[in-house]
């Protein structure tokens, strides 16, 4: 046998081996397909279990909950009822804890109530809503502190600064948490007072009564609902604090007025890690030791001498 014949024979054996390997693969192709179908079903089941576990830290409104600790089982919509007992100083402290509390402690209904308790609703609510209530509160507090330091007697500046800072720890009274009269503008408030007076109701809030749309009847003035039994006032607007998720899971329903809205309590993801921390720290500057140089300049700008400057900077 020549060399060329041997090469041809080797090439023929190589082709036979390739053909036989392809046939073997085709014979085993159907069983593999069956295994793939089983594996696909198992994969779906596993994915479903993973989704259920992941959704364990989410409520029906698709808002994330706290991932660990005793608050993991608390529905998101209940946090506003927990945080409404806190002062502005406490809310700012909560916002520094984690992403979720930063989101929950910035609730507009909380800061609107604190703002109106401290300063009253001096301007039409539509104009005020051009900015967030939290920002309005912090800006107004900072302006008041600067103005107080400029105008108060230099000998008593320390005490005035202490008194002004103490206002940040003012929490709502029980009557202010069940009654929304404090957040009404003067025009609507006058209408509410006249109606209550005509029905023999006083302006004092009743704290032992829980208003519900299923058991109470109401008199309505615009978006204000007045309980005919107690006279307690509820404002049902974009910042309504009494909303819950409907059984269908697609609308938020006020438990007092029955008004529905499609506004869900959704926590938006930050653009980058640590974004919420930076924002919370900036907002907390007025309440903490941050931005000391800026406040030192503002508080000491009108000091007459070095001794007065030193006394002022103790509280910067």
Curated annotation (Swiss-Prot):
Residues 68-114 form the F-box domain. Keywords: Ubl conjugation pathway. Residues 22-64 have a biased composition (Basic and acidic residues). The keyword Ubl conjugation does not apply. Pathway: Protein modification; protein ubiquitination. Residues 15-64 are annotated as: Disordered. It holds the Pfam family F-box-like. The keyword Glycoprotein does not apply. GO terms for biological process: protein ubiquitination; ubiquitin-dependent protein catabolic process. The F-box is necessary for the interaction with ASK proteins. Component of SCF(ASK-cullin-F-box) E3 ubiquitin ligase complexes, which may mediate the ubiquitination and subsequent proteasomal degradation of target proteins. PANTHER family: F-BOX ONLY PROTEIN 3, F-BOX PROTEIN 3. Part of a SCF (ASK-cullin-F-box) protein ligase complex. Interacts with SKP1A/ASK1 and SPK1B/ASK2. This is F-box protein SKIP31. The gene is SKIP31.
């Amino acid at each position: 046998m020549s060399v060329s014949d041997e090469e041809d024979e080797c090439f023929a054996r190589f082709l036979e081996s390739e053909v036989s390997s392809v046939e073997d693969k085709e014979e085993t192709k159907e069983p593999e397909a069956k295994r793939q179908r089983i594996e696909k079903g198992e994969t779906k089941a596993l994915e479903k279990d993973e989704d259920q576990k992941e959704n364990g830290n989410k409520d029906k409104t698709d808002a994330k909950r706290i991932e660990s600790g005793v608050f993991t089982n608390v529905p998101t919509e209940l946090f506003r009822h927990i945080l409404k007992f806190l002062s502005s100083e406490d809310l700012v402290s909560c916002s520094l804890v984690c992403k979720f509390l930063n989101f929950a402690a910035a609730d507009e209904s909380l800061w609107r109530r604190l703002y109106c308790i401290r300063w009253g609703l001096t301007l039409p609510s539509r104009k005020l809503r051009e900015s967030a209530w939290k920002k309005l509160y912090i800006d107004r507090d900072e302006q008041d502190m600067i103005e107080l330091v400029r105008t108060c007697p230099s000998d008593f500046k320390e005490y005035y600064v202490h008194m002004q800072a103490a206002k940040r720890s003012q929490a709502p009274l029980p009557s202010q948490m069940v009654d929304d009269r404090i957040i009404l503008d003067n025009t609507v408030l006058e209408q509410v007072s006249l109606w209550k007076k005509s029905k023999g109701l006083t302006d004092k809030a009743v704290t032992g009564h829980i208003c519900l749309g299923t058991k109470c009847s109401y008199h309505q003035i615009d978006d204000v609902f007045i309980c005919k039994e107690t006279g307690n006032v509820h404002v049902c607007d974009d910042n309504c604090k009494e909303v819950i998720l409907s059984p269908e899971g697609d609308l938020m329903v006020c438990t007092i007025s029955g008004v529905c809205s499609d506004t869900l309590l959704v926590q938006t993801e930050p653009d980058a890690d640590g974004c919420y921390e930076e924002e919370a720290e900036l907002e907390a500057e007025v309440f903490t030791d941050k931005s000391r140089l800026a406040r030192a300049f503002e508080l000491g700008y009108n000091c007459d001498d070095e001794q007065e400057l030193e006394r002022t900077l103790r509280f910067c």
